[in-house]
Amino acid sequence: MPKFTTNKEIAKLLRSISAVYAIKGGNYFQMIAYDRAADNVEHSTSELGDLWQDGKLGTVPGLGKSIQAYLDELFKTGRVGHFESLKKGMPAGMFELLSIPGMGPKTAYKLAKILKIKDIGDLELKAKAGKIRDLPGFGAKSEQDILASINETRSRTDRVILPFAYETAQRVLDYLKKCKDVERAEPLGSLRRMVATIGDIDIAGASKSPQEVIDYFIKFKEISRIIDKGSRKSSVLLTNGMQVDLLVGKPQAFGALLQHFTGSKNHNIHLREIAQKKDISVSDYGITVKGKLKEFKTEGNFYGFLGMDYIEPELREDTGEIEAATTHKLPDLIKLADIKGDIHIHSNYPIEPSHDLGKDSFEVLIKEAKHLGYEYMGLSDHSPGNSTHSEKQIVDLIQKRTYKIEQLKSSHKDIRILNLLEIDILANNKLSVPDVGLELLDGAIAGIHSSHRQDKKTQTKRILTAINSPYVQVISHPTGRLLGSREAYELDWPIIFKECVKNKTLLEINAWPNRLDLPDTLVKEAIGSGVNLIISSDSHAVEHLGNLQYGVSVARRGWAQKKDIANTLPWLEFKKWFNV
């Protein structure tokens, strides 16, 4: 197999083909298919090259047989003849511009074609020189918007989304734990604190034989290059592009090491200040009292020596957790086991949705929800496309789907099924489904899926439209952020929180890998304002249901307890949020 590309590069290639179809006026569903395939490839926790070698490309949602065949050609030869034919005649520079937030294919094509743009730097120079504003369909404002978007692109880092780093780290940890010399192995840093994006993966091991552990570690099959190797430390680069740093410490002092390298920096600075006032010092080796080092096997003992309760890693950001630990007022954080159901699940039911269709049938999803031990679940496909259907057509499609779901409710008495839809909050402050259609449902999840660049006042008004609707129970992915590609839009959060409480509307913590939205900081603010939250997987395939754990991590970072999350309630209490 030629050494081709990471998932990110393959996703970029697939998006370029979608762009070509958009410019050439190709089949709308071809465009959607390639966009969806790109999204699923980019957010896959397994490298596509590895899946291809194992004959498992078909396990990635959205990879139809034709795309699989093209990828097979890519991995075998390093090129795809069909893709090269499609791109013939297209200005090469346009494909680089597609990475700019808000830059659609037709705009990228027009700029690259007319101004002979070669890359993003070239576009920036032309924009600063005022060359864009005089083009047909552009103006001074659009020129400034392009410059702002270029700056946004440059501000991005090489950090990866939490689920990708987490599952990569789990493979390394599983390998390390098979070593007879390893007593414990744990992640460190931002990964252990479950931050939404991660840089390098840091791991700590406890062992009396550190050299043997290092020698074992560097034989991990996913390593592409050994960066550094010492007697206690080693850094390697994996085939998926992630760097993993391993540090091996003494078992009897592992608690202090784990605490120190978990961070955060601000949390540790605060601990150090407290220690100094007690005339002691803290380090990754332990706590020094009157010149004598005291070692700690566990973090619990480390914090206890400082007069504090154990602080969960997700809370260690110096946002009040140290004070709470000192006064024994830390929250009892929500756990994955507390979740009783998942209501944001997309299927492959042919409702002709406004956005991407799910991969699996109602029946497959119901079976997996039962396997997970859920009391209830929501089938919540995107509503029919508002721009491609009349109101009557939308209602007819909802009626047919409702009939199907009612049949499923009758045949699956051991799990409660909610007939929901995820509807669009349109740019004109209307919902994408008429009231007569919404009345057929058990409830609705509403979110913004277009016009993300409207100003704070306008976006807030759109969200309030949904919150004030008697048919909407949940606001999905409230900030609209896409980690690494789109910033959250500005909203007037105090007003939104107030209206959510008043209207008994739930704000979602969306666990989709590149959303993790509501962010943890807003989770904490929402809870403080009395808002109830719900954690959802937003799954588009049966295997995505497991993403819910990342939503739980976001909730924990936001200090959420079981009582703050609606879907920890048993069915008889939970159903009161909906029209059942």
Specify the residue positions occupied by each region the protein language model found.
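Accessory alpha-helical DNA-binding modules that contact the DNA backbone or grooves
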Residues: 4, 28-234, 241, 255-256, ...
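A short small-residue
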Residues: 14-20, 151-153, 380-386
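Charged, compositionally biased N-terminal leader segments and the immediate start
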Residues: 1-26
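Core AdoMet radical
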Residues: 378-379, 421-422
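Two-metal-ion RNase H-like nuclease active-site motif
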Residues: 185-187, 341-345, 422
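Alpha-helix C-capping/helix-to-loop hinge sites
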Residues: 17-24, 44, 153-156, 451
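Charged catalytic cores and adjacent phosphate/nucleic-acid-binding surfaces used
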Residues: 2-3, 194-339, 343-349, 360-373, ...
